[in-house]
Design a protein with these regions (language model features):
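Surface-exposed cleft-lining segments at the edges of enzyme active sites
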Residues: 93-101, 120-132
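Active-site beta-strand/loop signature of hydrolases that rely on acidic residues for catalysis
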Residues: 11-36, 119-122, 138-166, 191, ...
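Acidic/histidine-rich helix-loop elements
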Residues: 1-7, 56, 125-130
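Structured beta-strand-rich core segments of catalytic domains in phosphoester-bond hydrolases
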Residues: 4, 28-115, 203-205
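A conditional alpha-helix N-cap/helix-loop micro-motif detector
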Residues: 3-8, 101-104, 132, 136
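Alpha-helical scaffold elements lining the catalytic groove of polysaccharide deacetylases
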Residues: 127-143
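Short beta-strand micro-motifs in enzyme catalytic cores
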Residues: 76-78, 105-109, 118-120, 187-189, ...
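Metal-dependent phosphoester-hydrolase catalytic domains
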Residues: 88-91, 97, 130, 144-152, ...
């Protein structure tokens, strides 16, 4: 079911009801950052990506006719860290442009939590696996250097599939120590370094990502959320810290 109206409240309700400590969102309208953070009791780190010139005008058009403007509203990578969770909020925010120019500007949000966990949130180039591979490898090099010895969660829409782009995932493991993927044919992934996996990344089942409107099922995104759970084996600040993450 498709409706031509703003769905910010529905996104906020679904995200707030889910269980997580850190959430990584891509292609998120920039105006959603504050309402989502408030609804979830979270601190936010927003990194703008593409199509964000004249942002106020784009946002106004999106409120009036979301279907007409669609992704032309502008985008961002948004990382949310629940202040009351085991990660203790956000201690440091950085961002890095990982792809300049055509086809689109791509950025990565780098977030260090108060518990010491580092989070890299990115959206790699679409429809061009060679560009996506370059984006992801550049991002992994920067993220691991920035994180140092701290545990790292590296995730987002990588636009790479392990069954077709296996060499890239092997390089991520060998060069950067980043392991784990969602499924062989998936493009949304949560990879980890220095974390003990409790529940490996997996897609939400279809019914979990649907809401009911007028007796019909409405999906808020064409991407199924991915969630996983890890333990921080040596938390720098908190004892028995864990990470429950979703993208």
């Amino acid at each position: 079911m498709q409706v031509n109206r703003d769905l910010g409240a529905e996104f906020a309700a679904m995200l707030a009801a889910a269980e997580w400590d850190v959430a990584l969102l891509q292609e998120c309208p920039p105006r959603f950052a504050e309402p989502l953070a408030r609804a979830c009791g979270a601190a936010a780190h927003r990194a703008l990506t593409a199509r964000n010139s004249l942002g106020a005008l784009r946002a106004a058009a999106a409120r009036l006719n979301p279907d007409l403007i669609a992704s032309a509203e502008g985008g961002s990578n948004l990382t949310l860290v629940r202040a009351a969770g085991s990660l203790g909020g956000i201690a440091e925010r950085r961002e890095l442009v990982i792809h300049h120019g055509r086809p689109e500007r791509r950025t990565m949000a780098l977030t260090r939590t108060a518990a010491g966990l580092c989070v890299a949130n990115l959206h790699a180039s679409a429809h061009r696996p060679e560009l996506a591979a370059a984006d992801v490898q550049r991002a992994a090099a920067a993220a691991t250097e920035w994180a140092g010895e701290a545990p790292l969660l590296f995730g987002g829409d990588l636009n790479l599939r392990p069954d077709a782009d296996g060499a890239v995932f092997e390089q991520l493991r060998e060069r950067f120590g980043l392991t784990g993927f969602t499924a062989p044919g998936a493009i949304d992934h949560l990879l980890a370094r220095g974390l003990d996996a409790v529940d490996p990344p997996r897609h939400w089942p279809p019914r979990r990502r649907e809401i009911r409107r007028d007796g019909l099922a409405l999906r808020l995104s064409d991407h199924a959320p991915v969630e996983g759970r890890w333990l921080i084996p040596y938390p720098p600040r908190l004892d028995d810290a864990s990470v429950n993450s979703a993208i």
